[in-house]
Regions:
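Anionic-ligand binding patches
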Residues: 2-5, 18, 40-208
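Short, glycine/polar-rich helix-capping loops at beta-to-alpha or helix-loop-helix junctions
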Residues: 12-14
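Short, structured coil segments at secondary-structure junctions
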Residues: 20-22
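Glycine-rich beta-to-alpha transition loops that act as phosphate-gripper elements at the mouths
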Residues: 6-10
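Short, charged, surface-exposed secondary-structure boundary motifs
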Residues: 35-39
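A short, local hydrophobic-aromatic micro-motif
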Residues: 24-25, 177
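A short beta-strand-loop structural module common to alpha/beta enzyme folds
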Residues: 25-33
C-alpha cells in the first residue's frame, strides 16, 4: 500500500492532480516560510523544500509512533511553491488591492516569468528514502490592460490569493497573449515534469 501526500492547500494544485486521475491526501505545511535566497528559481526550490520536508517529518514521526497500525509502505510527499518574476522583482501574492494593482500594472503589456519549485520526498518503512528538488520556468506575455480593466479584474477578488495577482486559468485568461513553456506550471504545478522526474528513477505514480 502506497500513498501520495500534497503538502499544499492550493485548490489549483489539488485540481491538477485530480485532473490526471491521482488519488492523494492533502496535508498542508503550516510552518513559517523562511527565505534566504534572492534568485527566483532558488527561492521557489527553497520554499518547496521547506513545505515538503515539514510534512515528511510529520508523516515519519507518526509512522514511527504508530507501528502497530497499518501505515503505507511507501509515501510520496509533494511540496511546491510558485512566484512570478519581472524586471528583477519577485512577485508573490498581493498584500492588498493596491499591491495587486501595482503588480498588474507592471505586468501589463510585458513578458514575465513564472517559476514553480517542486520537492518530492520519498519515504519508506525505514524512513526517508530520497528527495528530488527542481524548478520549472514558463514565460508569459500579457496584453496591455487599461486601468479600468485592471480595477475590474481586481474587483472580482480573483487576484488576491495568486502569485503575481492573476490566475491564468481564470478571468485573467482574456489578457494572456502567449506563453512559452508549461501552462500547468503557471497554474501552480508542473505535473508533466513531476511525472517525468519520477519516471527517471523508476517510479510510476499510477502504480504507486
Amino acid at each position: 500500500m502506497s500513498q501520495i501526500i500534497l503538502a499544499s492547500q492550493s485548490p489549483r494544485r489539488k485540481e491538477l492532480l485530480e485532473q490526471i486521475g491521482l488519488e492523494f491526501e492533502i496535508c498542508p505545511a503550516k510552518g513559517e516560510e523562511v527565505i534566504t535566497k534572492t534568485i527566483p528559481e532558488e527561492v521557489v526550490m527553497e520554499l518547496s523544500k521547506q513545505k515538503a520536508e515539514e510534512v515528511a517529518a510529520m508523516v515519519s514521526s507518526y509512522s514511527e509512533a504508530h507501528r502497530e497500525i497499518t501505515t503505507p509502505s511507501d509515501i510520496l510527499v509533494i511540496g511546491a511553491d510558485t512566484v512570478v518574476a519581472y524586471d528583477g522583482k519577485i512577485l508573490g501574492k498581493p498584500k492588498d488591492e493596491a499591491d495587486a494593482k501595482a503588480m498588474l500594472t507592471m505586468l501589463s503589456g510585458n513578458t514575465h516569468s513564472v517559476f514553480t519549485g517542486v520537492t518530492l520526498v520519498l519515504i519508506d518503512k525505514s524512513g526517508r528514502a530520497g528527495e528530488l528538488v527542481f524548478y520549472e520556468k514558463t514565460d508569459v506575455k500579457m496584453h496591455e490592460m487599461s486601468e479600468e480593466e485592471i480595477d475590474r479584474y481586481i474587483a472580482t477578488g480573483e487576484p488576491m490569493d495568486k502569485a503575481g495577482s492573476y490566475g491564468i486559468q481564470g478571468k485573467c485568461a482574456i489578457y494572456i497573449e502567449k506563453i512559452d513553456g508549461d501552462y500547468n506550471n503557471v497554474v501552480g504545478l508542473p505535473i508533466t515534469r513531476i511525472y517525468q522526474e519520477l519516471k527517471k528513477i523508476g517510479i510510476d505514480i499510477y502504480m504507486w
